[in-house]
Amino acid sequence: MNKLIPIFLVLLIIGCSGLNKEYPTKNYYTFDVINDIKVNSNQGKNYIKIERVDVNHAYHHRDFNYRTGPDEFISDYYNQFYKPVGALVTSELYKWMSSAGIYKDVLPVNNLINAKYILDSKLVDIYGDFSNPDDPRAILNMQFFLVDDSSDVAELAYSNVYNQNIAISSKTPGALVEGWNEALKNILKQLESDLRTFENS
């Protein structure tokens, strides 16, 4: 019986050392985009509904994605969006359009009010481009479709692709998120300008 004690002690020590092993802390991030142009009230005559942003299948998970070579990508399990990225971008898009004052009101897609327009969108790309170690960049590309839903047959009224390639200070997750925020702000600002021009034409 005594011969089993040393083996048991060794196993116990190994088990305890495994329990004490430290793992990297997971970090969670979100977007924080503010429309700097203040509008007194919604000035338009039409309602618009905002569909949830569709996301390229490659970015359905919450992990950050890094491009490390011409055809090489890796995901970062320890740095993530705190919600699915489509939900986060949808929230920023809704807030931005609500503050733009282009339309009479901006509505969620499940609202029962009949809206003239529906805004569909797709997040095509979102990743950190670290393929050049000396020139890290934040990539964010989106596509938008403005659908006229005022008649029995919906028609595409406007569409455009917006691509952003932002130089960032380092390959850290914090710097990457700052770059994505800048990229998303640039896209929403240009989208607002284009939709305002279209609405006033």
Where are these regions (language model features)?
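A structural "domain/chain start" motif
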Residues: 16-87, 197-201
